[in-house]
Amino acid sequence: MASVTLRGITHRYYEGSGSVTAVEDIDLGIEDGEFVVLVGPSGCGKSTTLEILSGLSQPTEGNVFFGDKDVTNQPARKRDIAMVFQNYALYPHMTVEENMTFPLKQRGDVTGREAARAVEDAASMMGIDEKLDRLPGDLSGGQRQRVALGRAIVRDPEVFLMDEPLSNLDAKLRREMRVELQELHAALETTTIYVTHNQEEAMTMADKIVILRQGEIQQVGPPQRVYENPANRFVADFMGEPSMNFFRGRIIDGDPPSFDFEGQRTDPIPLSNGSVRPDQEVTFSIRPEHIDPVNSEDGDIVGEAALIEPMGSHFEAHVTLDSGDNVIAMLDPDTRLREGDRLGLRFDRARVHLFDTATGARVD
């Protein structure tokens, strides 16, 4: 096992007559045994970062360290890593056992008996020990992914690199495999760097998440801390389903200062934040689960229930405000509310977030 460090990593490639920056000035430290998830929308640079870590791509600038060793110019075959891909990358003409044994044969420093024992142990760990004589085409998607993971395990690498390994699975199987991956990491304690666009995977699996946008790191930290304290509007909007509600307005001077909603006929909301400036244009944000339905006269904002979506444990109320803006509130299933009803919405003041309207930076 090893710690992993990226220092000043930038990667550019040429397209047409110009260059495109895929990632820029990435600084990231990953501790030995940590499970880190790189998450972000398509094209944000997460897969490029993984390719640089693997040695499949070379950075234009910067260095990659495994422990204290600079591996920037070391090819993939000489790095002590194991990769797992979303398309499994199994040899269709080889049995499960042959697929899992293949990386050990390539290394050439393992005896046949040692290889057989490693495959047996990994297959047992992944629950595929009765499938060793099967071909990949005879297996389900979940079983093929377990073979791919087992093949990575037999290498006993310093670092696991995983690129969207669950994206081809259905929702139920994805959830099951997510749990298995967490159990696997707890058992092996191998440094793992995992790429996904799925925020649920990031929230549930990671010790630390790294949120990327347009090739730059937006925020790094434990999942719950990032969720509760987003560094900017992009992170606030990206993390969470449904996403945050956003309202434009301005700060009114006072003790305490208050927020005046743009286009709303409601009273300004007092704020506990002392760092905002009078007349500063800010975006007021709150998550759907931190909104309560109240009588119209008691609401921070007022509107009409346009759509109610039952979700089992709760329902999501889509409310059209008098200003024309739309808000999503996550409400208790026992709440008595029908489409077309007028209602007020009250915010949990301790859960309010403020972002500078011009820059998107957090100001609270």
What is the predicted role of each segment?
Residues 62-70:
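Conserved ABC transporter NBD signature motif
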Residues 39-41:
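The feature captures the beta-strand-to-loop junction immediately N-terminal to the Walker
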Residues 242-244, 253-364:
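Non-catalytic connector elements of ABC transporters
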Residues 76-234:
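ABC ATPase nucleotide-binding domains
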Residues 60-63, 214, 248, 352:
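Conserved coupling/switch loops of ABC nucleotide-binding domains, chiefly the family-specific signature
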Residues 5, 29, 65, 250, ...:
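ABC ATPase nucleotide-binding domain
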Residues 54:
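Helix-to-loop junction immediately C-terminal to a conserved catalytic motif
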